Amino acid sequence: MPMVQVFSIASILIWPIFLVFAVNFYKIHDKNKAEKFLAVYEKIKPKLATLLTLGLICLTYAGLVTIVLNSEMQEFIKLSENNNELVSVINNFVPMIGKLILLLLPLLMATWFSPMLIVYNHYSLFKSIKSSIAGCLMYIAPLGLSWLIFSTTAILFMLSCGVLIGSLASFFPSIGPSLMGAIIFFALLVITSVMFAFQYISYRDIFKSARSY
């Protein structure tokens, strides 16, 4: 468990840096350019401290959300362990997830564009956060619709993968666990890749008039 916690903390801290590397892949292909990894790193290097500070803000906010919902999470875990009625578990799960989404929404809006604005537009930390939130609010209808379509498609895709895993496991019990890991990894890779593409396209279209480097 301690190693998992350390990995989770490190992942949140470096997430803005990783996000810029990932989005840059779509940026260079969109502009038909070729850039080596070191060239991308040199572009990001002057902004590493700012990106890490953004990661620290994300970590702090996520920690506060965890504290706020900790009691409800603990109650849900106990309920799911001791209660075999699926309806009762779902009735407690849905409100908790609703609160989690509402609490994390400001963080999502603050960090949706800010890493790219820091690196490509040379915005300061707080200007990038403010501009990211403003961009999300100004285009909340198309972004919200796109997110709804993306989330629905991702859920259906994961459910389809679950059915595929169950079918393969019943036909090939000996290799079922290995296939399950490979299919889940592939599914998450596809979903994450599509999310990064959506993130780049929304950044490009919303901030197309802002000077970028």
Task: Please name every model-derived segment.
Residues 1-213:
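Hydrophobic alpha-helical membrane segments
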